[in-house]
Design a protein with these regions (language model features):
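Structural motif marking the loop-to-transmembrane transition
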Residues: 3-4, 349, 411
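Bacterial Sec-dependent N-terminal signal peptides
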Residues: 1-29
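Beta-strand-rich, non-transmembrane domain signature
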Residues: 26-304, 379-381, 385-448
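Secondary-structure boundary elements
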Residues: 297-373
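Generic secretory/membrane-interface signal
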Residues: 11, 20, 286, 306-307
Length: 448
């Protein structure tokens, strides 16, 4: 009887494996079919400027030249019936987004030939927050424009799966570009099809300077005005020209028809030195994150006032720090002993702060959420401190914020130069992580 049961289990597992393999095969077949359709649509809608080939004399010795650059972004916001409808009777808010980047690049030497002879990409990624997904399908398209005028379209049916990362758990795809030669042009695009439920989209960054010289650039956005879209132009970047289409979408356009030099290869930070535009697109209501007043205005806003955004962030800080602070009810015995011992100990404010910080850091980790309990614990112990808001390297400066989700909260012991930040391993108390060193900050010395 036991052998019969084991045989039944083995048969069941075998059938499950076959089903999984079939699903994976279907998924890949569906992806390839969709990708082929998208590529054909992109090739059939080639902008006029992608037919230009003239290169100014000053760029003829460059390794590669971007003859034309095109960026397109679109959003559509709607409600969708999901399993949530049967559980709570509510529809799920969803943003459908397409983000495409396309370049026509002239190959001038062996270095460029090597750089553009192979591409890596990820066909699909998925993450979850509060039971709602954020899915991205990426479609890559490549064709080679030969010197004699012929066009060779790269076949993606045989892309190679490559296992990378720790224990080979990260799967990416690679494709070679056969037949590419010096003097050819390569027309390449990457299209992300994104759908996200009850969440804001990841920020979009439009850099107006690239690693190669660019002769012509255009950015085109068609944005659903039911969403809250804000952007800021940095380092001399211009604003978009905004119009409205027949469907009442906001249409943003930016054209740069003058050549732009390549970024320097060394000692260069694009977020500090290159002109760029940072954009956040957020639903005005969502079930997974708090959307404060400054982020609830529908439509598109350019270079908004920072003050309301900071006020919202101070409000959020007070809420989170207070809620996650010290309360003797529900604390584990280990926590209770630590805080009672520190309350009765004859220690300086710095010593108490170092011990609380280190204890929480070791027990709970490096996240902002874990760090938030530290200042409130210290206040309960009678330690005076000042809370602060800043942003890390790579984010917009705190005095040019457009979204409070990019901020970091920290504190300083009052009357000292000792600062405490969330951070990464390894780290000691009162050490400022390099990503915050030299960054602008706002301080507040009151719990209110």
């Amino acid at each position: 009887m036991k052998n019969v049961r084991m045989a039944g289990v083995a048969f069941f597992l075998l059938m499950m494996q076959l089903v999984c393999l079939s699903v994976k095969a279907d998924n890949k077949a569906d992806y390839l079919k969709l990708a082929q359709k998208v590529r054909q649509e992109v090739w059939d809608n080639t902008p006029v400027d992608f037919k230009k080939r003239a290169v100014p004399e000053k760029f003829k010795k460059e390794s590669a030249v971007i003859l034309s650059y095109y960026k397109e972004l679109s959003t559509d916001y709607h409600r969708k019936a999901t399993t949530e409808l049967f559980i709570s009777g509510r529809l799920t808010r969803q943003i459908d987004c397409e983000d495409m980047e396309r370049m026509l690049i002239q190959i001038n030497d062996k270095k460029a030939l090597k750089d553009y002879s192979e591409f890596s990409f990820l066909t699909k990624s998925k993450k979850w927050q509060g039971g709602y997904h954020h899915t991205t399908n990426t479609i890559l398209g490549i064709r080679v424009l030969k010197k004699d005028g012929t066009v060779q379209v790269v076949d993606f049916d045989d892309y190679v799966d490559v296992k990378e990362g720790k224990k080979g758990k990260e799967l990416s795809q690679k494709i070679a570009v056969p037949g590419l030669e010096i003097g050819d042009c390569i027309d390449v695009f990457s299209l992300d099809q994104i759908d996200t439920q009850e969440q804001q989209l990841d920020p979009f960054v439009f850099f107006l300077r690239q690693s190669e010289p660019v002769l012509y650039s255009r950015i085109h956005c068609v944005l659903d005005q039911s969403l809250a879209t804000v952007y800021r132009s940095m380092n001399g970047a211009p604003e978009f020209k905004q119009t409205t289409d027949k469907d009442k979408n906001a249409v943003l356009d930016l054209t740069m028809d003058q050549p732009v030099d390549a970024e320097p290869s060394v000692w260069y930070n694009a977020t500090v030195q290159s002109p760029y535009i940072m954009m956040f697109i957020t639903p005005t209501k969502t079930k997974t994150v708090i959307v404060e007043k400054a982020m609830r205005q529908k439509g598109v806003r350019a270079n908004p006032d920072v003050a309301p955004i900071l006020q919202d962030d101070w409000k959020l800080m007070k809420t989170y720090v207070s809620k996650n602070g010290y309360s003797p009810i529900g604390l584990s015995g280990k926590y209770t002993r630590v805080f009672k011992a520190l309350k009765n100990a004859d220690l300086s404010a710095e010593e108490k702060a170092d011990r609380i910080f280190s204890f929480e850091y070791i027990c709970a980790g490096t996240s902002q959420a874990s760090f938030n309990v530290v200042p409130n614990y210290l206040r309960k112990l009678g330690v005076e401190l000042e809370m602060g808001i800043t942003t890390p390297l790579g984010a917009l400066p705190v005095d040019q914020l457009i979204n409070y989700n990019s901020t970091t909260w920290f504190f300083r012991l009052k009357g000292t130069n000792l600062y405490y930040f969330p951070g990464t391993y390894p780290k000691v108390a009162s050490e400022i992580p390099y990503i915050y060193q030299g960054r602008k900050a706002y301080m507040q010395d009151s719990e209110e």
